[in-house]
A protein has these predicted regions:
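Glycosyltransferase donor-sugar binding loop
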Residues: 55-74, 91
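A charged, aromatic-enriched C-terminal amphipathic alpha-helix characteristic of glycosyltransferases
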Residues: 155, 159, 176-211
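Conserved donor-binding/catalytic core segment of Leloir-type glycosyltransferases
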Residues: 19-36, 41-44, 48, 57
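Nucleotide-activated donor-binding/catalytic signature segment of Leloir-type glycosyltransferases, i.e.
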Residues: 70-96
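Short hydrophobic beta-strand element within catalytic cores of glycosyltransferases
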Residues: 131-134, 141
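Acidic donor-binding loop of glycosyltransferase active sites
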Residues: 103-117, 130
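Donor nucleotide-sugar binding/catalytic pocket of nucleotide-sugar-dependent glycosyltransferases
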Residues: 1-18
Length: 211
């Protein structure tokens, strides 16, 4: 189909209400496993040697799409996650549960290897006031609007993992030394840019062209 015959409308979310983060540092990964979970696990394991009190919540399964069979290649990784004392593997849960978890999370740890065209997981984490650590890959720079902790992506897994570790280390260190940074500007941008109020008006205008 010619590009001139298409029309792009961005994603939208219901903003996550303002809240206080808990004292213990929590990281979260809440997207499907093929997007970078295999990089996150060893990096987090290494990070725990330096920060033994951090915790990672993993909400990840193709079951959310009804494709549970696609979890098969990742089951050994899921088992490793379950064994780790600093990781809780939750599998697939409702978006309501994810939004609750984001309110308790300090860092969205997302070493993406997937060519996103947009990323609702990132948008919701930004709205929740999380420090979002991710590469400048595909549409993530556009989605984040420059408000996140973004590093240069590399196709080599070891290089990617090392850069991801460095940025995660910096985020954890900042929280320990200075407390959770002021994220209201990030939240304001996200809640304004990706609000349903804004997006519904765009849809009304778009659909009005066919009236």
């Amino acid at each position: 189909m010619p590009y001139s015959h298409s029309h792009i409308l961005q994603n939208a979310i219901t903003p996550i209400k303002s809240h206080q983060k808990p004292n213990n540092i929590n990281l979260i990964y809440h997207t499907t496993p093929h997007r970078g979970l295999q990089i996150l696990y060893p990096v987090f394991t290494e990070l725990c040697k330096k920060y033994p009190d951090i915790h990672l919540d993993v909400y990840s399964s193709f079951k959310i799409y009804g494709w549970e069979q696609r979890d098969e290649p990742f089951k050994p990784l899921f088992e490793e996650l379950k064994k780790h004392p600093n990781i809780t593997y939750h599998g697939s849960v409702s978006n309501g549960k994810i939004r609750e978890a984001l309110q308790k999370a300090h860092i969205f740890a997302y070493p993406s290897i997937w060519q996103e065209t947009s990323c609702i997981a990132l948008i919701e984490a930004m709205s929740a006031g999380c420090i979002c650590v991710h590469p400048n890959y595909a549409a993530l720079p556009e989605t984040s609007g420059g408000w996140t902790s973004m590093y240069h992506w590399d196709e080599a897994p070891n290089i990617h993992a090392n850069r991801f570790y460095a940025y995660l280390d910096g985020a954890v260190k900042h929280i320990l030394q200075h407390g959770m940074p002021y994220m209201e500007n990030q939240k304001f941008y996200t809640d304004t840019m990706y609000s349903w109020d804004k997006r519904s008006k765009e849809w009304e205008q778009f659909l009005g062209n066919f009236g």
